[in-house]
């Protein structure tokens, strides 16, 4: 004996609804980052520097990593590289400095290179993005904003540690 059409449709609908409500698997932890080697112009160093410069004036916020919420130094760097090149960097300046990216001699800096500093500690505590002509963009301190500074400024020259190219 055949079941009436509404009786056949109801079990199919219930089955479809049950399949839609299945729990989604939780994402696992992010893998440890190893920086790809960037060849001049490949990732778009100009895009990186333009994006970084466009964020000048954004308020500093400790732990911040968005234009809307403000930036700290590593949040700014992470945002720019993620936004422009799809590269997800570690969260702190020290962790970013430890990625497998080549160190760059101070005299060979190119736009988009990362510059790292030590402030009264042995470990890296600050990072910025080199934009050319001896300048870099960074989020320096509470109460300030993202800004351009010169690497040859006495303070930054004294605290400069290393540069890396991603």
What do the predicted segments below correspond to?
Residues 51-59, 79-87, 118, 139, ...:
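Structured segments of extracytoplasmic/periplasmic soluble domains
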Residues 17-19:
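C-terminal motif of bacterial Sec signal peptides marking the signal peptidase cleavage site
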Residues 26-74:
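Post-signal-peptide N-terminal segment of Sec-exported extracytoplasmic proteins
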Residues 1-10:
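Bacterial N-terminal signal peptides that target proteins for export
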Residues 2, 21-40, 44, 103-105, ...:
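Aromatic- and glycine-rich peptidoglycan recognition patches
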Residues 36, 58-111:
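Catalytic cysteine-centered active-site loop
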């Amino acid at each position: 004996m055949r079941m009436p059409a509404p009786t056949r449709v109801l079990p199919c609908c219930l089955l479809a609804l049950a399949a839609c409500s299945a729990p989604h698997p939780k994402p696992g932890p992010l893998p440890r980052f190893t920086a790809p080697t960037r060849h001049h112009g490949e990732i778009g160093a100009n895009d990186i520097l333009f994006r970084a410069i466009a964020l000048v004036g954004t308020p500093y916020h400790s732990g911040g990593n968005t234009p809307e919420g403000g930036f700290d130094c590593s949040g700014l760097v992470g945002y720019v590289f993620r936004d422009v090149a799809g590269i997800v960097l570690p969260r702190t300046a020290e962790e970013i400095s430890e990625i497998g990216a080549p160190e760059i001699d101070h005299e060979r800096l190119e736009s988009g290179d990362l510059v790292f500093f030590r402030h009264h500690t042995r470990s890296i505590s600050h990072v910025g993005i080199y934009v050319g002509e001896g300048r870099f963009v960074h989020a320096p301190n509470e109460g300030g904003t993202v800004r351009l500074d010169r690497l040859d400024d006495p303070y930054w020259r004294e605290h400069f540690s290393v540069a890396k190219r991603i």
